[in-house]
Amino acid sequence: MGDRVAGKVALVTGAARGQGWADALRLAQEGADLIVIDVCAPLPSVVYDSATPEDLAETVRQIQKTGRRVISGMADVRDLDTLRGLVDDAARRLGRLDVVVANAGICVPKAWDQVTPKIFDDTISTNVTGTWKRLRQQRN
């Protein structure tokens, strides 16, 4: 393993399962402390099971096994105020924030002509707007 993130603090959104979980665990294995965020609730237009609080707790347990510090929180990336509060508090507690992995996203598997305006808006607001808001807020 490399040491490119050793001693750094990383934020991973969408960290309870899938790619976000894998990213968070790998960062911890490479020596980063983590802030892990996931909505852990059903989302509009999403037909598959969303991550749960138990999934996020398991992510935390796996990171703790690496010996790294971890702070978790539940937030929707579209809710900038809540996300900002969680991340700012966690970054204060961990000393800083060096890396952002804006991974949260949804997928609504439908043919293009079956995608309603609501489904489209939910997908764009989560996958694009939520990510943009998070990164923009971090810059400021």
Indicate where each model-derived feature is located.
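A short, exposed helix-loop element centered on a Lys and neighboring polar residues
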Residues: 135-136
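The beta1-alpha1 cofactor-binding region of Rossmann-like NAD(H)/NADP(H)-dependent oxidoreductases
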Residues: 53-57, 74-86, 117
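Rossmann-fold cofactor-recognition segment
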Residues: 61-79
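A glycine-rich helix->loop->beta "capping" turn
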Residues: 66-69, 89-100, 108, 119
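Substrate-binding pocket helix/loop in short-chain dehydrogenase/reductase
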Residues: 63, 111-112, 116-124
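Canonical Rossmann dinucleotide-binding motif of NAD(H)/NADP(H)-dependent dehydrogenases/reductases
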Residues: 2-41
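Conserved glycine-rich Rossmann-like NAD(P)H-binding loop of the short-chain dehydrogenase/reductase
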Residues: 32-58
